[in-house]
Amino acid sequence: MAPKGWPLLLESLGWSDPELWWSHWQQRGGFELARRVWPADVKDQWLLGVALPLLSQAESLLQMGGRPLLGLSALPGCGKTTLCDWLVHASSELGWSIAFLSIDDFYWPGPELDRRMAGNPWGVPRAIPGSHDLELMATALDQWRETGELLAPRFDKSLRDGRGDRSEWVRSTPDLVVLEGWFVGVLVSDQASEAENIHSLALTTEELVYRQQLFRLVPDYAPIWNRIDKLWHLKGQSGTSSRLWKRQQVETQAKTTGVHVSESAVQDFVRMIETAFPAAWLQDLHQSDVVIDLTNQRAVREITLK
């Protein structure tokens, strides 16, 4: 069953008749398109309500030309990396050239990253504002748009005992780039800050002080967000959805790769996600074009357009 708002999304992508849209994708493989990328238990509703419409968005942007940048924002553990990986493989099968970048690829090199993350109250080695080389990110995106060549670093989170480091540089010539991250599109909102229930978070003095430092860094990301042509937001049921999703992600990672993350590290990371920003900053992205509301089980509840 298609989620609420799905027909309007298709219409915004140039498909007024959902049956014609479905026929279009059935001829290209439908749910079997790049199926190998998905976990065995992927739901058809996810493919119908999220994956194939996102592929349609990419197709629409490619038809417009100009080397478009498609943004994808979602809390950690939501499945956005797998979604982007599928998008690249599906596009390749269709003969399109699409690449995806995470803002995490632009973390500072190890020693500089350690310096910038020192003293944060959650003890996280990365992920928060200030951990990214924004000048490098802007340069990589701008040079790609000007020349067609994308040169970007990759970050391996398993290096340096889990603190991570740059591992390689990748050169490609995509016609479209997807930029994903857990706070892509987040902007400072005084109104949301005022509405926040500080007491319910039980913020420590250290957290209160440090998050003000983060708030001052958030505007530095706006020039990157402004480069995005279309922004999709996979919105969790609440600001605490990542608590469940991250644990599931860590469990899956341990089973598939043998890499284990300590319980304390998971707790620190989740605490950071829940307290680094007011929840409304993550839940209500003013620049988003498509919002897909998800349950804690990652089922699509509703799709809205902005």
Which sequence ranges carry the predicted segments?
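The Walker A (P-loop) glycine that initiates the GxxxxGKT/S ATP-binding motif of P-loop NTPases
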Residues: 74
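Conserved lysine of the Walker
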Residues: 80
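Hydrophobic positions on the alpha1 helix immediately C-terminal to the Walker A/P-loop
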Residues: 83, 87
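Conserved nucleotide-sensing/catalytic segment adjacent to the nucleotide-binding pocket
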Residues: 38-42, 99-102, 106-160
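Walker A (P-loop) phosphate-binding loop of P-loop NTPases
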Residues: 77
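Conserved NTP phosphate-binding and transfer environment spanning the P-loop NTPase/kinase superfamily
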Residues: 2-29, 183-306
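Extreme N-terminal, non-catalytic leader segments
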Residues: 1-70
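Post-Walker A helix-loop "phosphate-sensing" segment adjacent to the P-loop in P-loop NTPases
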Residues: 89-99
